[in-house]
Amino acid sequence: MLHETISLALLGQPLVPGLMVVSAILYLLYSTQQWRPKNLPLLNDAGPFDFLQATAVKRFRRDARQLIKSGFDSYNNVFAMRTDVGVELFASPEYADQFRNHPSLKVFPFTAKMHHGHLPGFELCRSQPVEDRILIESVRTQLAQSLGKMIQPLASDIGQAISDRWPSESGWQEIALGSVIERTIAQGTSSVYCLDEAWPEFVVKMEMALGMASAALSAWPVMLRRVVAKFLPECLELYRIMDAGRELMSRDMRRRVALQASTGEAPLNFFEWFKEASHGEEYDELILNLRIAFASMHGLCDHLVKILLRLSEDPQLVDDLRKEVIQVYKTHGWSKTALYHLKLMDSTFKEVQRVDPILFAVGRLAVADVALKDGLIIPKGQSIRISGHTMWDEDKYPDAAHFDAYRFYKLRQAPGQENTAQFTSPTSDHLGFGYGGRACPGRFFAAAVLKISLCHVLMKYDIKPANGETGPHVWEFAAAINANMTANVLVRRREPEIRL
């Protein structure tokens, strides 16, 4: 087990003072060797008395959006900035087309760098070439080809999850929206990840533990993180949960094998799709399944909470969406065609993603030296982020600061924009799902789950802010815009016009 490799004798010692002394020594050596851009301005640099760059890191975590804006206001297209992973490059959206399919600018290595994927216990964020290829192929090919057959089962599973997790009493009931959504999505999508009854609670704990461990470790200097990770309480908790996850997934795999042997049917789940996509190459199927489950859960829950917080304050939009659901379902039932025709709902999702994207700077890591057309050289191992600030640009989106759920619904009616205005269509002006060949490969599955979930909620519940007060929908941390998962709302069971 991971946690058993840690020397327990060290845990009771006064580690922090000792580590700080070591930090001071290493800082003097390390700070002179860090990569610094030769021909680019460096923002948010550590001052001479900024011990271990702590102030610079704190400033980036607190004010990243304003720092990035000031960088582009002052330096136009490209600049460097000190962040919580060292010095990174930031490029304007004009670079998006050069980045979109560049073979040496990778997503998974970037994620691994951001979230310590090279360290034991953080395997959920690691990048390994064979696993990365299998993950992408299984989503783009096997999952995509199976999606049509999955709509009805997903609708049934999500409907059951809502029945199990949401209030059944009449009258208004206050709920912790984030917690309810996490468990609803975990249970409703469990068939493609894990059938064990412990899965929903496990995956919620896993997501929380990884987020807390990653944030806690990021507060330490890069050169100390491998050592510090062995002692931080948040990391120790992550190790414990990862051990439990391996046991749970192993138990589920045995159950699936037995089930398939008895029925003779090939199940629709990632374990089977990984086998097909591996083409005989070796991989860690337990870690790969947890990797994709974590990525899916995080994005789905974040987006659905943002949507529902918006809807809790907009009864007219709720009414319009309900009318659309009734009309579409009566005609198409549960099908891919039905989800396509939920055009106002699709527009609402895309507008929420425009206003509050989960990341407002899309990252890549150079796995080889990269030379761009204007002469910019990105050295191997260097991360670079493309800013998504065009999503808030008045020239691109009139009245951009205003949330308009009908914005993309109207754009889809304009000649030539039927496809680009769809939720799952990334463009250089809307980087919510990334861009190019490395845009989020699971976005079609995500859109299906989100639409099915919202259909059920709209038909079965009224929703409004708790205590009549509208709180913040999101909170920002570094370059992320996270849903306010602690928000409470009031929900009331209603008699649906149609039975889904």
From Swiss-Prot:
Cofactor(s) essential for the protein = heme
Question: Does the keyword Hydrolase feature in the UniProt annotation?
Answer: no
| Keyword entries, A-Z | Heme, Iron, Membrane, Metal-binding, Monooxygenase, Oxidoreductase, Transmembrane, Transmembrane helix
Instruction: Name any one Pfam family assigned in the record.
Output: p450
Under the heading InterPro entries, the entry gives:
Cyt_P450, Cyt_P450_CS, Cyt_P450_E_grp-IV, Cyt_P450_sf
- Localized where? Membrane
Q: Give me the segments passing through the membrane.
A: 8-28
User: How does the record say this protein sits in the membrane?
Assistant: Single-pass membrane protein
Q: Which PROSITE patterns match?
A: CYTOCHROME_P450
The pathway it acts in is:
Secondary metabolite biosynthesis; terpenoid biosynthesis
Q: Which GO terms describe its molecular function?
A: heme binding; iron ion binding; monooxygenase activity; oxidoreductase activity, acting on paired donors, with incorporation or reduction of molecular oxygen
E.C. no: 1.-.-.-
GO BP terms, alphabetized = mycotoxin biosynthetic process; terpenoid biosynthetic process
User: In which residues is heme bound?
Assistant: C440
Q: Which GO cellular component terms, listed alphabetically, does the Swiss-Prot or TrEMBL entry include?
A: membrane
| Family of the protein in this entry | Belongs to the cytochrome P450 family.
A further note on this protein reads: In A.calidoustus, the austinoid gene cluster lies on a contiguous DNA region, while clusters from E.nidulans and P.brasilianum are split in their respective genomes. Genetic rearrangements provoked variability among the clusters and E.nidulans produces the least number of austionoid derivatives with the end products austinol and dehydroaustinol, while P.brasilianum can produce until acetoxydehydroaustin, and A.calidoustus produces the highest number of identified derivatives.
Give the protein's biological function: Cytochrome P450 monooxygenase; part of the gene cluster B that mediates the biosynthesis of the fungal meroterpenoid acetoxydehydroaustin. The first step of the pathway is the synthesis of 3,5-dimethylorsellinic acid by the polyketide synthase ausA. 3,5-dimethylorsellinic acid is then prenylated by the polyprenyl transferase ausN. Further epoxidation by the FAD-dependent monooxygenase ausM and cyclization by the probable terpene cyclase ausL lead to the formation of protoaustinoid A.
The name under which this protein is listed is: Cytochrome P450 monooxygenase ausI
Species name: Penicillium brasilianum
State the encoding gene.
Answer: ausI
